[in-house]
Amino acid sequence: MLKQAKKKGKPVIYHTHTTYEDFRGSIKGSYVLSPIIKFWTKKLYNEADYLISPSEYTKNLIKSKYLEKDKEIRVISNGVNINKFNKNEVLKEKFLNEYKLVYDINKPLIITAGLPFERKGIKDFVKVAQECSDYQFLWFGSSSVKSMLPDKIQKIIENPPKNLIFPGYVDKDILIGAFSAAKAFLFMTYEENEGIVVLEALSAKLPLVVRDIPVYEDWLEDGKTCFKARTNEEFCQKIRNIVENNVENLDEITETAYNIAVERDLLNIGKKYKEYYEHILNQKNR
């Protein structure tokens, strides 16, 4: 398809959402397969005329480790639907009614979402749940991949601590209800190209606790738009500060963070794509 497009004089654009770094620590054999992933992504990214990355971090990663010669890379966020991901009292009650027989809904709720990969920090998430045993933890994410996960991760999902539940994939209304009921969103990933669930948490004005990794350096600020941690002890402390109201300006932090989601609303992202595609076509017609 790439060669056919080039023969017809059509510009080829690739989205750099797949990287060697992002693939490791996912499914069974990912550490063995990741060099193959890097070989093919490197080949394809070099053959493309234009590249689009979801973050400055990914852009710099592609430039430094994948491209053989300099190439234009435009950064355009994955985006978030801010009209869908906002706190909703009706959906909150729906969620609590559905889960009141599953866990003690009087406990402070800490949530996360995403595929339960090792790279996503699932082992540390379990340790934090054990340390903060007076809180309830939920990890939302497709359970259909369970058989593809390493045995050690499958065992975690099958035998979690009493205060941790893996509901798997849930209806969007239930998920938004959980966002509305939770005290914090805990995202302990070790590697990310942006993190759509991060944008969803910001959009819902849910206090966000993330691992202090390079992808968040230039757009999430500790104590201003989120809370960053490096160790499990730090994660526990950040969560406790939020739950126990030991953060004086928490509302201000979530409001400032919400502005990031507004900037990355899908309507704005659509405009950016339109502008960039028009720019590419203008370049072609010169």
For each feature predicted by the language model, list its residue ranges.
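Short hydrophobic beta-strand element within catalytic cores of glycosyltransferases
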Residues: 207-210
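Nucleotide-sugar donor phosphate/pyrophosphate-binding loop at the beta->alpha transition
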Residues: 11, 22-43, 60
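Short, structured helix-loop element that forms part of the nucleotide-activated donor/catalytic region
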Residues: 136-163, 174
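Short alpha-helical donor nucleotide-sugar binding micro-motif in glycosyltransferases
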Residues: 169-170, 177-182
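Aromatic "clamp/platform" in nucleotide-sugar-dependent glycosyltransferases that forms part
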Residues: 190
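Conserved donor-binding/catalytic core segment of Leloir-type glycosyltransferases
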Residues: 102-120, 126-130, 138
